[in-house]
Structure formats: C-alpha cells, structure tokens
C-alpha cells in the first residue's frame, strides 16, 4: 500500500508525505483515533516500519521512486486524557495532556519510533499534546536529549500545523522555545499571535531572536544541516524535477486493486449466523446512510480537512460493489428481496471536531435498521467507522455484522467479503 501511495504522491510533484502516524490511541473518544494502526505497541511498530520502507524505497513494478516519510506525532498523542483538550475544546481530548512517566514513554510510546529510525525515516513531526503539562513543541528533553541524542536521529524535526502557537507566551517566545527544543522546521500558516502576515512575522521575530542570542547560530546551523541532509539523501538536490512518467501509474487499475485488497484484509466480521456469504442469484435491499457515499467511506482528511459527505471523489461506493455481484433495489423493479444490507456509521471528522463521548449510531442510522427489521427478512449490518462504537444491541438483533472501518474509495472490497470472494 505504501509503495503505491509513494508513486501516487510523487506523480503530483510532492516528494514528502506526513505519514505514518504511529500514535497508540488509548481512548476511542479521541477524534484522531482512526489515524493510529492499533492500541498495541507491537502492531503499531510493525505497520509503521513497513510504511516507511514502502515510502522511501519504493519499487512497484517498473517504477522505482521514493518519497520522504514522516513519523508522527512525537510523542504520546494517543495518551491524552479526556477533559484536557486545548483552548475552547478543554472539555474534550485532542491536543490535551498526557500525564505519563518517562518509563511509560520508553516502554509503550517510544518503540514505534525506534523501529521508524531503524527503517531510516527522514523526518519526525512534533505532537500538539502536552506531557505532564509541558507542550511537546517546547520540550527539549524529547527532541534534543531523547530523539536526537540518545536515539541518534539525524534527520529533521518539523512542527505540526501552526503547532508552536499553542505554547504559552507571546509568539516570539514560542519561536525561541520551539527552535531551542530541537524543532528544525516550523509550519506557520494562518494568523499568528498579534496578527500580521504569518511568515513575515515569523521571519522578523526569528531573526531578532538570533541577533539577540536567544537562538544560537549553532542551533540554526544544525537545523539547516539536517534539512539539507534529508534533501540530499532523498535525491531532491540531484534530481529536483518530477518524473512525469509516474502519472501513468496514478489511479491505475493496479493501484486500485491494491486498495481493494487492503479493504478485504482489514474488515472485521463480528457476527454471522449463516447468512454470509451472500448469493449472486438473490436480490438484496441495500439501504443506510453509507450505502452510496464515498465521502463517508473515506472519512476525514479527504479533499477537505474534515472530509465531506457525498461522492466527492472518483471511486466505488459499497452499493456499486454489491451490484457487481447481484441486483439491488436500485434496479429490481419487482421489489422482492431475499435479504437486506444496511450500511451505517460515522460521518467524516478529524482532530478535535471528532472528539465525542457519545459513541453511538445516529438516530437516522437506527431508523434505517428499524425499517429493515419491519421487512421480516434477514439482514446484514455494515458499519463504517473510524473507531469502535457501542452497538451491542444492534449486533445481537442482526443476522450478520461486518465492521468495514474506513474503506476509502474501493467499496467493492466490502462487497467481496459479503459475497465470499
């Protein structure tokens, strides 16, 4: 998957991907829960390493290309506590505080980063959260002592999106604290404290800080050296232009097949009382908010920051995939059905917008299930979600229950499992 992703990204002219996220989510209420591979350190370590190798040493078919990977978010973003979220989200969890010991950091949250470094990851992104009430973006122990010193990381550290602005103090002190803490590249989009054009304000205050000795030139030289090192290693200096032949692979049938296989292998069947696999010769009533919605399948970070409902990008919806096998209520004029498939689940979200302590299906989704129950035919529930939800009663009442997670643009992979392919 990461090899194909590298080719797709490189084809656009972008040579750096802010991935993999090797967070270890501990609270399903967190709006970034789905960005982590697992709550188990060994799985996260293994998946993160594989992604980095795929991104940075890509060799897929006749294409030999790579992009720079970024392990994120350093560190313990999945360990924050509900009720410690940032600013006006203080009643939530995203960008909150992780009250954890150094020994727990080393035992649970550091191993995926060690595997990332062993795999040669080029960059690491700082985390929005705090550890014991100290913002990671200002925590020199994490980056100077632990990551660069003890672990020997010689790539560069980048801030998160406007991440230094959340450090207590004025904007100049944010710059000084973050750069001295070991951040080598700062993302400064949007407005900054005190207003003004963000990049001009940053450059002015950064230069002042160096001139005043608040940031030593040695620290600046180190940051520049690290950034150039990654550029040389990635081949960007010797070959800065995009290989346009990669466009032939972008959106190719080969890549779509890889995505579809990934969907097939990531689903979880929680219940089957014999209704699955479905039969090609029967007719199915397909309903629910997620039956024909690629945006819902993709979730957040798709086209827009928070994602968007609807068929917002080319792909195969779940009902499209089902109709590759059998007829549905979209083309069955007789209105006689042997069973029903109800596709329900979460609408797209990301970050603090997805923080929620109400991990239940919406009233609309429950109505769709109740509608099918009244038809007195067997039914399968397919759940689209970025995290576990409380659906015990729905599982009990259904004939089969399949968790599709966020299958992306290849909804046909869900249909493959329903029909036993």
Predicted regions mapped to residue ranges:
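Glycoside hydrolase catalytic-domain context in secreted enzymes
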Residues: 1-421
């Amino acid at each position: 998957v990461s090899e194909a992703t590298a080719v797709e990204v490189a084809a656009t002219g972008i040579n750096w991907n802010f991935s993999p996220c090797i967070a270890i989510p501990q609270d399903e209420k967190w709006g970034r829960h789905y960005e982590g591979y697992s709550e188990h350190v060994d799985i996260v370590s293994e998946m993160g390493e594989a992604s980095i190798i795929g991104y940075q040493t890509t060799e897929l078919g006749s294409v030999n290309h790579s992009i720079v990977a970024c392990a994120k978010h350093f560190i313990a973003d999945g360990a924050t506590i509900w009720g410690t979220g940032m600013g006006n989200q203080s009643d939530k969890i995203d960008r909150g505080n992780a009250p954890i010991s150094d020994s727990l950091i080393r035992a649970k949250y550091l191993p995926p980063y060690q595997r990332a470094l062993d795999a040669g990851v080029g960059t690491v992104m700082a985390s929005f959260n705090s550890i014991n009430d100290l913002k990671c973006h200002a925590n020199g122990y994490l980056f100077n002592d632990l990551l660069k010193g003890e672990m020997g990381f010689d790539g560069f550290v980048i801030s998160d999106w406007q991440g230094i602005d959340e450090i207590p103090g004025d904007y100049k002190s944010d710059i000084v604290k973050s750069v001295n803490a070991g951040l080598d590249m700062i993302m400064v989009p949007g407005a900054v404290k005190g207003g003004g054009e963000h990049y001009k304000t940053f450059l002015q205050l950064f230069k002042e800080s160096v001139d005043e000795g608040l940031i030593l030139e040695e620290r600046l030289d180190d940051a520049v050296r690290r950034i150039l090192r990654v550029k040389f290693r990635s081949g960007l200096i010797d070959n800065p232009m995009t290989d346009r032949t990669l466009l032939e692979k972008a959106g190719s049938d080969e890549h779509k097949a890889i995505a579809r296989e990934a969907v097939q292998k990531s689903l979880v069947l929680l219940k089957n009382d014999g209704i699955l696999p479905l039969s090609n010769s029967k007719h199915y009533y397909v309903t629910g908010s997620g039956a024909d919605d690629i945006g819902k399948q993709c979730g957040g970070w798709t086209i827009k920051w928070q994602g968007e409902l609807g068929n917002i990008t080319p792909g195969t919806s779940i009902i499209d995939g089902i109709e590759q096998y059998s007829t549905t209520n979209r083309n069955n004029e007789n209105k006689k059905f042997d069973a029903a498939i109800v596709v329900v689940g979460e609408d797209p979200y990301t970050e603090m917008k997805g923080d929620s302590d109400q991990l239940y299906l919406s009233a609309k989704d429950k109505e769709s299930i109740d509608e099918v129950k009244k038809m007195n035919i067997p039914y399968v529930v397919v759940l689209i979600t970025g995290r576990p939800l409380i659906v015990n009663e729905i599982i009990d009442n259904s004939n089969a229950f399949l968790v599709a997670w966020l299958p992306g643009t290849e909804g046909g992979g869900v249909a493959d499992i329903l029909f036993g392919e």
